């Protein structure tokens, strides 16, 4: 049986991941049909969705940064065994809204826990699984925060409320990851129109899948 293909969408808050997925999924479904599995993090399965409510909700402002990192990793571990690993083993294309790179950028960089420390936690949680392709939406932190406050006033989560300096560290860490892993992580200019971003993303996905299909 053909081995599955794992794609992740990453980016700082306000970069437009939701818009990209809304524009991208219809085209991908037309191409791949039932072979495409869409999911998200934290979440994707029941236990992980429950953790999502705790770690992203506004109910626990006292949450320690290490607690935060471990909760994200715990949600990811359950997501892996219940959804991602079985789908990949079945030869599916898995498209996830966020994965390990988010933890490295947000907790490793933004929370200053360190890239190596957060990487080790998540290596244990995922048994070392890495995506085949990661699309990183990038834009200035000031622009991203402005978008959040303008368009997502009813859905702002705990991480959205962090200071600008936090979000700048997140972006810097993402860009460092892309610099270190250029074959896997492809950077998309998130200041472009949603339609243009979706076209570029679809092209990158199709190019990456040429040897797989």
Curated annotation (Swiss-Prot):
Signal sequence, renumbered to the chain: none
Gene3D superfamilies (alphabetical): P-loop containing nucleotide triphosphate hydrolases
Catalytically driven reaction(s): dTMP + ATP = dTDP + ADP
Recorded GO CC terms: cytosol
Keywords, comma-separated and alphabetical: ATP-binding, Kinase, Nucleotide biosynthesis, Nucleotide-binding, Transferase
GO molecular function per UniProt: ATP binding; dTMP kinase activity
Transmembrane segments: none
PROSITE patterns, per the entry: THYMIDYLATE_KINASE
Record-listed E.C. numbers: 2.7.4.9
Keyword Transcription: no
Binding site for ATP: 11-18
Keyword Transferase listed: yes
Gene Ontology biological process terms in this record: dTDP biosynthetic process; dTTP biosynthetic process; dUDP biosynthetic process
EC primary class: transferase
Function: Phosphorylation of dTMP to form dTDP in both de novo and salvage pathways of dTTP synthesis.
Family stated for the protein in its record: Belongs to the thymidylate kinase family.
Name of the featured protein: Thymidylate kinase
Originating gene: tmk
């Amino acid at each position: 049986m053909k081995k599955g293909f794992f794609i992740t969408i990453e980016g700082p808050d306000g970069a437009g991941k939701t818009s990209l997925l809304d524009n991208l999924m219809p085209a991908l479904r037309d191409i791949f049909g039932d072979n495409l599995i869409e999911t998200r993090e934290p979440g994707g399965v029941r236990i992980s969705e429950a953790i999502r409510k705790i770690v992203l909700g506004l109910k626990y402002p006292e949450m320690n940064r290490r607690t935060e990192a471990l909760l994200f990793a715990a949600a990811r571990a359950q997501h892996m065994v219940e959804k991602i690993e079985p789908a990949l083993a079945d030869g599916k294309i898995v498209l996830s809204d966020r994965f390990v790179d988010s933890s490295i950028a947000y907790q490793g960089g933004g929370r200053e826990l360190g890239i190596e420390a957060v990487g080790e936690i998540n290596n244990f949680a995922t048994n070392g699984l890495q995506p085949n392709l990661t699309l990183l939406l990038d834009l200035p932190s000031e622009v991203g925060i402005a978008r959040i406050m303008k368009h997502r006033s009813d859905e702002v989560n705990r991480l959205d409320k962090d200071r600008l300096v936090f979000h700048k560290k997140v972006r810097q860490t993402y860009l460092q990851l892309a610099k270190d892993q250029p074959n896997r992580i492809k950077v998309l200019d998130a200041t472009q129109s949603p339609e243009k971003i979706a076209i570029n993303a679809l092209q990158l996905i199709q190019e990456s899948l040429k040897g797989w299909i």
